[in-house]
């Protein structure tokens, strides 16, 4: 079993990184709302990696569920154009670390340094659509596709990352999720009832930005964003307006003066016709008339790279049964531990649940394991209490400490199996 001594602590931007000695040379490369990302060297594989620390994943049930979702997606989605999970571990402080390939830069940074030549625009768009074809075939929507979520290495290999916002293809989806410039109009117009087509819109915006070197729809706010979209596409058609669910949004849209669309060939005069044709098929107001990733791959513009024998789909749909679950933190904790153990092919531990079982069965097993841990903690705390001298303040302090330690030992005993792999796999 891994001990605290098997992990090395270091401060990065005031944040404690607690990793095994397999990983060295930590340098910060990015900071998100829920985690810090560092580059590092994997001394076992002899290659650079990115390590994302999920801070306090078990502090709330919402954060625990979000982390569980991201882990499940990273385990399920395995494709050349998606960032792939190489390692995952739980530190003694119960932070979770995801280890993935390290790409040299992202598309956002690349676009700020120089304009892209035609062949790079083609190749990057091809890889984006190739990745989306796979993601969508798995029943997953990225929802936050933007240049900073598209990673590129020195060989121009492209990988889509950050599936933290990814969701099921669900007929009733709500909320603002994607960065405004790349947000599909159906998200702005309805805030629900959207599908995989939102990713195609985002990819179209990225395509235009790669072509022109600047964002196509740089909206200052929600209203301005919609306005500059209609500057190009014209007013939304009636069948799109009829899908608007928000009464206020409907009043706003119908109050606007009618606008005629600008022909794409006039707006993009310096762009080759085949590129303009594909872009026009991606940026369509009606999501049901928007081209799919699979169809876009066979478009003549991408002919130099299209290979129907090497554009795979997912082996199975992603299981979203957990998505509506409202579970306590300790249940999510046990399920997370089991996923980590499963990733490292470690089995046979006490209470370990079968990650291939139905979600309901997993929840039942995880709930039982968490309840058992709590019962053990309570029994051990009571035993300490009975054997202590209640009149001694030092004993009272010892008793409280023993109870805390007992509870911690009980609930983390299950999870220590997840830490255990450090001995077997990281040396």
From Swiss-Prot:
Active site, renumbered: 144 (proton acceptor)
UniProt-listed InterPro entries: Kinase-like_dom_sf (IPR011009), MAP_kinase (IPR050117), MAP_kinase_CS (IPR003527), MAPK_p38-like (IPR008352), MAPK_Sty1/Hog1 (IPR038783), Prot_kinase_dom (IPR000719), Protein_kinase_ATP_BS (IPR017441), Ser/Thr_kinase_AS (IPR008271)
Catalytic activity: L-seryl-[protein] + ATP = O-phospho-L-seryl-[protein] + ADP + H(+); L-threonyl-[protein] + ATP = O-phospho-L-threonyl-[protein] + ADP + H(+)
Entry's Gene Ontology cellular component terms: cytoplasm; nucleus
PROSITE patterns associated with the record: MAPK, PROTEIN_KINASE_ATP, PROTEIN_KINASE_DOM, PROTEIN_KINASE_ST
Annotated keywords: Activator, ATP-binding, Cytoplasm, Kinase, Nucleotide-binding, Nucleus, Phosphoprotein, Serine/threonine-protein kinase, Transcription, Transcription regulation, Transferase
GO MF, any single term: protein serine kinase activity
Modifications after synthesis and translation: Dually phosphorylated on Thr-174 and Tyr-176, which activates the enzyme. Phosphorylated during osmotic stress.
Coiled-coil regions listed: none
Short motif (TXY): ranges: 174-176
Record: residues binding ATP: 29-37, 52
Family annotation (Pfam families): Pkinase
Predominant location category: cytoplasm
Domain Protein kinase, chain residue ranges per copy: 23-302
Biased composition (Low complexity): 380-400
Domain of life assignment: Eukaryota
Regulation of activity: Activated by tyrosine and threonine phosphorylation.
Entry's EC annotation: 2.7.11.24
Record's subcellular location: Cytoplasm; Nucleus
Record text about domains: The TXY motif contains the threonine and tyrosine residues whose phosphorylation activates the MAP kinases.
Role description: Proline-directed serine/threonine-protein kinase involved in a signal transduction pathway that is activated by changes in the osmolarity of the extracellular environment. Controls osmotic regulation of transcription of target genes. Involved in resistance to osmotic stress and tolerance to methylglyoxal and citric acid.
Membership in a protein family: Belongs to the protein kinase superfamily. Ser/Thr protein kinase family. MAP kinase subfamily. HOG1 sub-subfamily.
Protein name according to UniProt: Mitogen-activated protein kinase HOG1
């Amino acid at each position: 079993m891994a001990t605290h001594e098997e992990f090395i602590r270091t401060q990065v931007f005031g944040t404690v990184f607690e990793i095994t000695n397999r990983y060295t040379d930590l340098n910060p490369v990015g900071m998100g709302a829920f985690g810090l990302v560092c580059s590092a060297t994997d001394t076992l594989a002899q290659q650079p990696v990115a390590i994302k620390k999920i801070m306090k994943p078990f502090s709330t049930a919402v954060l625990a569920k979000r982390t569980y979702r991201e882990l499940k997606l990273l385990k399920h989605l395995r494709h050349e154009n998606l960032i792939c999970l190489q390692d995952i571990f739980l530190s003694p402080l119960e932070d979770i670390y995801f280890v993935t390939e390290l790409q040299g830069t992202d598309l956002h940074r690349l676009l700020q340094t120089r304009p892209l030549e035609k062949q790079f625009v083609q190749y990057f768009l091809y890889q984006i659509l190739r990745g989306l074809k796979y993601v969508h075939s798995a029943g997953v929507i990225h929802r936050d596709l933007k240049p900073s979520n598209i990673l590129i290495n020195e060989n121009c290999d492209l990988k889509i990352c950050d599936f933290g916002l990814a969701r099921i293809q669900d007929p009733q989806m709500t909320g603002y999720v994607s960065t405004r410039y790349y947000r599909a109009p159906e998200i702005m117009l309805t805030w629900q009832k959207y599908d995989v087509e939102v990713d195609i819109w985002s990819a179209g915006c990225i395509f235009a930005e790669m072509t022109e070197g600047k964002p196509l729809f740089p909206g200052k706010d929600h209203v301005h964003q919609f306005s500059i979209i209609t500057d190009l596409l014209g007013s939304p058609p009636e069948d799109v307006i009829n899908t608007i669910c928000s009464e206020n949004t409907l009043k706003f849209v119908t109050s606007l003066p009618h606008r005629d669309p600008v022909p794409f060939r006039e707006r993009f005069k310096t762009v080759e016709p085949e590129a303009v044709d594909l872009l026009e098929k991606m940026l369509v107001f009606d999501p049901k008339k928007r081209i799919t990733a699979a169809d876009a791959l066979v478009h003549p513009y991408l002919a130099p790279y299209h290979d129907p024998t090497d554009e795979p789909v997912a082996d199975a749909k992603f299981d979203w049964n957990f998505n509506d679950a409202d579970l306590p933190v300790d249940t999510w904790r046990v399920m997370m531990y089991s996923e980590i153990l499963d990733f490292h092919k470690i089995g046979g531990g006490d209470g370990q649940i079968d990650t291939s079982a139905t979600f309901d069965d997993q929840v039942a097993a995880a709930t039982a394991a968490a309840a058992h841990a709590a019962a053990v903690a309570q029994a051990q705390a009571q035993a300490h209490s009975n054997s202590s001298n209640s009149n001694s303040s030092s004993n009272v302090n010892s008793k409280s400490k023993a109870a805390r330690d007992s509870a911690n030992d009980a609930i983390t005993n299950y999870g220590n199996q997840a830490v255990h792999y450090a001995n077997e796999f990281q040396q």
